[in-house]
């Protein structure tokens, strides 16, 4: 029997000490309290806390200790080393793709709460903004990344995977920190980066009421590189109150405000003229978000409940787009004999006001509600084998009911070897604009005169995935894993041209009578398959020396539609990440890493196939030094060999050699 395989005692300990979501924990435990340590515990795989090796999913955890060692502009930088994850876009449009699925299928969570504002961008799919709403580095306790569909637990948008940002708990004693970072580019055409993060937290009334404050300022100068980084200015802050009336109840109230500004100048990061030869104008775009949240965790004997109410308002005034999202979610978890039962209810309501309808109708407001019931049972059939079954029924105002089941097994074959595997389903409802017949969304880029018409006959996209994992833990510092995955994608929504003007011909919309260069709409036409391999290894060679590496192979093919037999997305076939971490003494840390991205084949880019791109690799090196108990410094050289990756050659722009400096003061 595997050591420490005590399902019910461990479960009871966890549920008596912690909330279902780490972000709603009220006060951090004292170091000498007899509690389960969080180092190997995750919450995203089932909504309940469990050891990583027991979690019914392929999951990667990035600890706070690892996050503090390197330079991060946003969460995309934090995920560079995760197997199966590809950071797409480049420049100011970086986004997160998991196992070959487009970024729109990756769900972003903060403490298990959805963050979805893609509707506030033109065509609802522009990248690079979504992660700007996530907490700053100083606010993060850890990041949990689930690779593969999780719609049975999280609903629509979790078809590709989940990134869950777990924030820090309110401390029992007053503490704080200020972290300042500077990145200087060797190439004067690339913009320098400045950022500052603030954290402050502590008790107002001992053991009853606490407060936590986060703040961030991020600024990047504009590149003088076509399709390079825009001028970016981000300001965000949040305040959270945590109230513990007694040991059985935790109540939180949170307010967060974020502002993102992006500016491009013709002749710098944007083209001097449009495709017709007319001078381009400078682009100044601002996004504003305000988010309110109330949370409650209750412990009622063996039963634990986790409930939250969240409302967010996101504005894109430069494009006259305004989005309101309201959500209510409750989970109930109960260990019962050899079962861990979880059930819950979720409700969300989206309201979009967009003044950019080019169809000629007077429609400006779109809305949709969705509710869901879900249940899971983690059943410990033997001391070494657990089977998790889950089912979610989602009722969408526009698309009716959808059932998303999953079944996953975890077998600890020996003390060292674990076999995991299962099947899961996913679905994603079309975006609000996509299915409205009288909606015409502007497209065609700067100076363009084109429109995409909504299609009321669209169906939700669906997926069916299988995976199998072998995990080896020597219990002496060496870990390795091999995962095989296969995803069948059905009813993919594809954009198609229905009219393309040539010569003196024109495409005219009735009503309105406006002539466009081209008119597109969307259809459910495509089937696709994504499959691959993820291999990982980690070796703690000495107490102060660690080697880590992972490799991902991804294959994708469209099985139907006009591009049958071609690759689906711009995903490298081969990806390799490797790192070395060395602590010569308790105050000094040295690290280096390499990120390799293999070539991509031709891939579908909206209505046509785009050329594949060549391979590239980045090598980084850094050092962190603890000056004293209150001051830390970090130095780094990124892209040591100055590999140039430009939009012209690679379809995205990444920085060349640059130098990083950070100073953190703790108090």
Q: Each PLM stretch: what is its role?
A:
Residues 115-147:
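Short acidic/polar hinge/loop motifs at secondary-structure boundaries
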Residues 179, 380-387, 486-488, 508-604, ...:
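Gram-negative outer-membrane beta-barrel transporters
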Residues 325-334, 338, 344, 366, ...:
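Outer membrane beta-barrel strand-and-loop segments of large Gram-negative receptors
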Residues 114, 119, 270-272, 351-353, ...:
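Surface-exposed extracellular loop regions of Gram-negative outer-membrane beta-barrel proteins
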Residues 6-7, 13-15, 28, 201-203, ...:
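Conserved C-terminal beta-signal and adjacent last beta-strands/turns
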Residues 75-78, 94-97, 108-111, 130-133, ...:
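N-terminal periplasmic accessory domains that precede
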Residues 171-285:
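Periplasmic-side early beta-strands and strand-to-turn transitions of outer-membrane beta-barrels
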Residues 39, 76-117, 141:
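Extracytoplasmic beta-strand/coil segments of soluble accessory domains associated
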């Amino acid at each position: 029997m595997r050591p420490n395989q005590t399902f019910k005692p461990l479960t009871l300990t966890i549920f008596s000490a912690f909330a279902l979501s780490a972000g709603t924990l009220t006060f951090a435990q004292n170091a000498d309290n007899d509690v389960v340590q969080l180092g190997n515990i995750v919450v995203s795989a089932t909504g309940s806390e469990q050891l990583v090796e027991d979690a019914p999913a392929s999951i990667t955890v990035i600890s706070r200790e690892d996050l503090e060692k390197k330079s991060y502009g946003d969460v995309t930088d934090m995920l560079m080393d995760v197997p199966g994850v590809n950071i797409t876009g480049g420049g100011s449009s970086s986004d997160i793709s998991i196992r070959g699925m487009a970024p729109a299928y990756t769900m972003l969570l903060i403490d298990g709460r959805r963050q979805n504002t893609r509707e506030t961008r033109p065509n609802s799919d522009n990248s690079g903004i979504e992660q700007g709403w996530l907490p700053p580095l100083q606010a993060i306790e850890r990041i949990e990344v689930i690779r593969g569909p999780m719609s049975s637990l999280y609903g629509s948008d979790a078809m590709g995977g989940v990134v869950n940002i777990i924030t820090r708990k309110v401390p029992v004693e007053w503490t704080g920190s200020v972290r300042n970072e500077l990145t200087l580019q060797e190439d004067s055409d690339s913009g320098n980066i400045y950022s500052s993060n603030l954290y402050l937290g502590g008790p107002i009334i001992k053991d009853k009421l606490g407060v936590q404050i986060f703040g961030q300022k991020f600024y990047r100068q504009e590149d003088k590189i076509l399709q390079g980084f825009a001028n970016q200015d981000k300001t965000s802050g949040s305040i959270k109150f945590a109230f513990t009336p007694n040991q059985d109840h935790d109540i939180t109230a949170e307010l967060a405000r974020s502002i993102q500004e992006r500016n491009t100048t013709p002749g710098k990061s944007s083209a001097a003229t449009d495709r017709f030869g007319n001078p381009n104008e400078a682009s100044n775009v601002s996004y504003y978000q305000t988010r309110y949240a109330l949370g409650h965790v209750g412990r009622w004997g063996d039963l634990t409940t986790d409930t939250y109410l969240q409302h967010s308002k996101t504005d894109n005034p430069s494009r006259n787009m305004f989005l309101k999202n309201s959500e209510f979610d409750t989970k109930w978890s109960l260990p019962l004999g050899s079962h861990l039962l979880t059930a819950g209810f979720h409700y969300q309501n989206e309201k979009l006001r967009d003044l950019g309808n080019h169809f000629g109708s007077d429609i400006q407001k779109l809305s949709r509600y969705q509710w869901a019931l879900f249940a899971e049972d983690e059943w410990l059939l033997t001391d070494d084998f657990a089977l998790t079954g889950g089912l979610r029924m989602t009722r969408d105002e526009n698309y009716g009911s959808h059932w998303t089941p999953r079944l996953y097994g975890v077998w600890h074959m020996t003390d060292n070897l674990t076999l995991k595997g299962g099947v899961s389903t996913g679905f994603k409802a079309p975006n609000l604009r996509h299915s409205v017949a009288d909606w015409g969304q502007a497209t065609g880029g700067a100076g363009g005169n084109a429109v995409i018409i909504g299609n009321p006959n669209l169906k939700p996209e669906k997926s069916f995935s299988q995976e199998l994992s072998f995990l080896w833990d020597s219990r002496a510092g060496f870990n390795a894993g091999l995962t095989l995955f296969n995803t069948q994608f059905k009813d993919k929504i594809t954009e198609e041209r229905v009219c393309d003007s040539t010569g003196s011909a024109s495409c005219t919309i009735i009503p309105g009578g406006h002539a466009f260069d081209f008119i597109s709409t969307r259809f459910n036409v495509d089937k696709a398959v994504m499959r691959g391999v993820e291999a990982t290894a980690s070796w703690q060679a000495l107490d102060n020396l660690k080697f880590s590496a992972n490799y991902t192979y991804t294959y994708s093919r469209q099985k139907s539609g006009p591009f049958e037999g071609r690759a689906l997305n711009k995903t490298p076939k081969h990806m390799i990440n490797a790192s070395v971490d060395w602590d010569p003494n308790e105050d000094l840390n040295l690290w280096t890493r390499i990120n390799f991205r293999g070539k991509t084949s031709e891939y579908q880019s909206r209505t046509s196939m785009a050329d594949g791109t060549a391979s590239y690799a980045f090598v980084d090196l850094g050092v962190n030094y603890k000056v004293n108990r209150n001051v830390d410094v970090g130095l780094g050289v990124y892209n040591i060999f100055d590999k140039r990756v430009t939009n012209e050659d690679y379809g995205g722009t990444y920085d060349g050699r640059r130098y990083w400096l950070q100073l953190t003061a703790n108090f």
